[in-house]
């Protein structure tokens, strides 16, 4: 053994070939600060071996290196810019030493090589991969850019266009594509990986492969003519401006850095990467996006812990076909859980099966599946008008009309047709689970399971724990949701649960703005372009359905009369009374026509202004800041109340539910991350200016306490250790 660290070791393999093996404790390798330091120490040993002929890098895990240790990011990003820059210089000196070894080097890459893992293998001369490879640089999705030389080496290896596509979009690619673009040099089966790697190294050692020529382009300026450079970078900047926009600075910074570094060799180019990375790491966007990643890990870990002793349901059923039922059935079948889809008429069943078939055909068109797989999946969805097969079902989700009487009747009937241990769930969006449970003999086997539309795209499923829901019931439904590829978040019961409970105060803020003379078009524009929502409130209401929102608004008002009962006729009432139900019938706040792809495209409709005139005062202009404040304060206050009342268990779960269920702008990180970034005291000062607008604008006492004591909702993060100590393992 030449060197043994906590996460890697170095040893002789054969004939002057050494192997550096990443083998961290636990299930995966991460390129954390300790591993970078350990790699430097291993290279120091290696540099003294005069009989060294070649170096093989490999992993003892199912994945090569999954990336940097993102749990370290928030503390690293808190160190002063100069110290962070120094540490990056140190880390890059380690990878430069790997790249500068006087012998050929090869990385045998299995599974994932992402972020720092990818940057590590870019420093080797050759890369051999297994068919399950996923390799790429996802840093821009975290609000930063590659910092270990990825933005320098990748363009010089692949050419500007392919590298820009991967770096700016934060993409990873599979083995076949990586081979095509030159990111790896060969693909071999896992059992042949080491044998193949040694064979390539031997060819390089004997001179049959010119490893020096392979290495040289990574050390030089990017080989692009002025015209080629202008075309590549102009196109890339245009694409990034269109897709990322102003709220996500990292992709544009990465493109501009690669452009600026193109005319320099490795050392100068790395200095430019360093100068661009450090300011990005100190942005609110980076903290928010890293926070989302960590919250996602927390939520998934919580679900895994909850279901560790639970067997995933093997047979499911959906009550109520149609678009929603068909979407749920598709998702379950697609992920391997057969499903019975029951309805009371053939028309609805046909609609549900058509929806499932449409979604599968899209997978076929994209090349994700073949005809055989499509037929196999669709055959596991069994449409029926009766309860045949329900005695074999492990879990049933009811997705009928949003009417408590109908839902109670359907659930009570179904309870008599299933085994005593079968779990029943309701896909209600607003009706309290306790109310629906009153119709059941076994309420402990019942809970809520709120999917979001469209089911196949929306990652969140709200799991609602009723007063009598058992832990086993919750665990079974969480297990099914996880199996479906969804992110389940458990909340406690109340009208609207968590997501809709906080959404309708936001809509109420919108209605009050229109009542006071705001133009809905400007409100939409400000909330989309300035705050960053994917849709403004008017557009969102049209997509949800004005009729659906009108009904839900009444349910929420009955549940929370003190705050959500309104004493005036609002825009939603006016549109509902005029049968303008939104996208579903082509008329809402906007008029909708199908585009060439059959998707609804919104257009202005002057007729809506006459309708809204009856429920609004004389038009007046509002500043962007006032619109944002009046829209967001009711939502933020309600989110805080939900945490204080125990409806949602933690700021992390609340923020993930908002991002995954409502599209809360990820660069803000969620409501609690946004609050912490603003500071509770600053938020309180802003909110107090609008308290005269009613109870929805009254700040909860818990938040006032946070403001008084200057306390954040997330635990404070301590800066990383001094840079000098990070240079040792």
Swiss-Prot record:
It catalyses: a (3S)-3-hydroxyacyl-CoA + NAD(+) = a 3-oxoacyl-CoA + NADH + H(+); a (3S)-3-hydroxyacyl-CoA = a (2E)-enoyl-CoA + H2O; a 4-saturated-(3S)-3-hydroxyacyl-CoA = a (3E)-enoyl-CoA + H2O; (3S)-3-hydroxybutanoyl-CoA = (3R)-3-hydroxybutanoyl-CoA. Residues 708-729 are annotated as: Disordered. It comes from the Bacteria. Keywords: Fatty acid metabolism, Isomerase, Lipid degradation, Lipid metabolism, Lyase, Multifunctional enzyme, NAD, Oxidoreductase. PROSITE patterns: 3HCDH (PS00067), ENOYL_COA_HYDRATASE (PS00166). Coiled coil: none annotated. The keyword Transit peptide does not apply. Transmembrane segments: none annotated. One of its GO terms (molecular function) is NAD+ binding. Residues 1-189 are annotated as: Enoyl-CoA hydratase/isomerase. NAD(+) binds at residues 324, 343, 400-402, 407, 429, 453. Pfam families: 3HCDH (PF00725), 3HCDH_N (PF02737), ECH_1 (PF00378). The record marks 119, 139 as: Important for catalytic activity. Its EC number is 4.2.1.17, 5.1.2.3, 5.3.3.8, 1.1.1.35. Residues 311-729 are annotated as: 3-hydroxyacyl-CoA dehydrogenase. Involved in the aerobic and anaerobic degradation of long-chain fatty acids via beta-oxidation cycle. Catalyzes the formation of 3-oxoacyl-CoA from enoyl-CoA via L-3-hydroxyacyl-CoA. It can also use D-3-hydroxyacyl-CoA and cis-3-enoyl-CoA as substrate. Heterotetramer of two alpha chains (FadB) and two beta chains (FadA). In the N-terminal section; belongs to the enoyl-CoA hydratase/isomerase family. In the C-terminal section; belongs to the 3-hydroxyacyl-CoA dehydrogenase family. This is Fatty acid oxidation complex subunit alpha. The gene is fadB.
